[in-house]
């Protein structure tokens, strides 16, 4: 008799995706981040759902409702901080997942990669609108500054900004619609994740060597389920340590001051995971130029498959490309640090240099290094 998991219409899908899935035998721990992102998404949806039960999306009561969750709701404080720090863990996993894709040439699976970039945009949008909800100072001014960037669009800019605001400033209408967006977007992310997996399972996983692994595949369960559980336990451990020992480590103290349109915080800055893009935005002296650079800093990922000039897929055997990759990682971290610094010398100059290097590495230096490595193969 055939096992029910192989015959039942629903269980068959789960079986082919998570149990009997043929997987390369040599994928490393860098391949853990996909499942960790799935775990993060589930945790965020669950904690978010419980927060939404007690939150009120109204300018007069939003801040108080968040404080009420922390003080009066049973275990509300831990739900709130798991949600806030869960977002940080989400982005750590996202950046590691993208870095893995860049290093090992996973972007050659173009459909999977492009859906991944769309997912990144959606997660960033969700995190941005979510940060506005507690209605603290940084929530309000962050929303004002970032939405205002759209006014740089010629001709329709101002109309567009006022349309998003639902008025002439960030106010009640803005908060209400941002809450609606923040509630619906995670489910869109969930749907996109399924499409992402669908495209991935059409081709099968890549592996560290970047060569076909058709001759050496093993079932996903138990080999990789146990490996994923280990990764999940480590992620949960880090998240719990962050939440229970230093819940406000990654947050901004300004957000404990209720939103006040009449007083601007000394330094307006987004959460740490947007700082690299914020640094690129600030590096361009022109408003429209800055907005375009900001967009391009993420959209550039879509061009990476087109910029692949190497005869090898993975960077495993390409020392020049490896050096440039780690230079890009260092540059990303530098931009993240600079994004959190005030707009003054020397940070401005460093930010401009780091921004130029960011685009130069991806668009020019890495494709050139690949061509040089191709030549070296013939020696």
Swiss-Prot record:
Domain of life where this protein originates: Eukaryota
Pfam families: Cytochrom_B_C, Cytochrome_B
Cofactor: heme b
TM regions (residue ranges): 33-53, 77-98, 113-133, 178-198, 226-246, 288-308, 320-340, 347-367
One GO process term, biological-process aspect: mitochondrial electron transport, ubiquinol to cytochrome c
Keyword Transcription recorded: no
Cofactor remark from the record: Binds 2 heme b groups non-covalently.
Chief location: mitochondrion
Binding residue positions for a ubiquinone: 201
Subcellular location: Mitochondrion inner membrane
Family indicated by similarity: Belongs to the cytochrome b family.
Function summary: Component of the ubiquinol-cytochrome c reductase complex (complex III or cytochrome b-c1 complex) that is part of the mitochondrial respiratory chain. The b-c1 complex mediates electron transfer from ubiquinol to cytochrome c. Contributes to the generation of a proton gradient across the mitochondrial membrane that is then used for ATP synthesis.
This protein's name: Cytochrome b
Organism, as annotated: Mesoplodon peruvianus (Peruvian beaked whale)
């Amino acid at each position: 008799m055939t096992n029910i998991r192989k015959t039942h219409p629903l269980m068959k899908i789960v079986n082919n995706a998570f149990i009997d899935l043929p997987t390369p035998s040599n994928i490393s721990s860098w391949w853990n981040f996909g499942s960790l992102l799935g775990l993060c998404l589930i945790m965020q949806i669950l904690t978010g759902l419980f927060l939404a039960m007690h939150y009120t999306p109204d300018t007069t009561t939003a801040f108080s409702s968040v404080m009420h969750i922390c003080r009066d709701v049973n275990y509300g404080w831990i739900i709130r901080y798991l949600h806030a720090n869960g977002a940080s863990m989400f982005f750590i996993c996202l950046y590691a997942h993208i870095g893995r894709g860049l290093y090992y040439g996973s972007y050659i699976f173009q459909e999977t990669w492009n859906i991944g970039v769309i997912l990144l945009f959606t997660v960033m949008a969700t995190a941005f609108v979510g940060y506005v909800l507690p209605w603290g100072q940084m929530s309000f001014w962050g929303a004002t500054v970032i939405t205002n960037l759209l006014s740089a669009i010629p001709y329709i800019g101002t109309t567009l900004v006022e349309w998003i605001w639902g008025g002439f400033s960030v106010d009640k209408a803005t908060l209400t619609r941002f809450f609606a967006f923040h509630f619906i977007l995670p489910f869109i992310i969930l749907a996109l994740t399924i499409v992402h997996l669908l495209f991935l399972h059409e081709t099968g996983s890549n592996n560290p060597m970047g060569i076909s692994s058709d001759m050496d595949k093993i079932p996903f369960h138990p080999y990789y389920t146990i490996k994923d559980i280990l990764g999940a336990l480590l992620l949960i451990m880090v998240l719990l340590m962050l939440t229970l020992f230093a819940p406000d480590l990654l947050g901004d103290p300004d957000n404990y001051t209720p939103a006040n349109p009449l007083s601007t915080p000394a330094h307006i800055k987004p959460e740490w995971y947007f700082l690299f893009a914020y640094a690129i935005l600030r590096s361009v002296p022109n408003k429209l130029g800055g907005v375009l650079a900001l967009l391009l800093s993420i959209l550039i990922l879509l061009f990476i498959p087109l910029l692949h000039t190497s005869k090898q897929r993975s960077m495993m055997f390409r020392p020049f490309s490896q050096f440039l990759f780690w230079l890009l990682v260092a540059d990303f971290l530098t931009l993240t640090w600079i994004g959190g610094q005030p707009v003054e010398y020397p940070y401005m100059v460093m930010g401009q240099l780091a921004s130029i290097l960011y685009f130069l590495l991806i668009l020019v230096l890495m494709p050139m290094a690949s061509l040089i490595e191709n030549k070296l193969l013939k020696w």
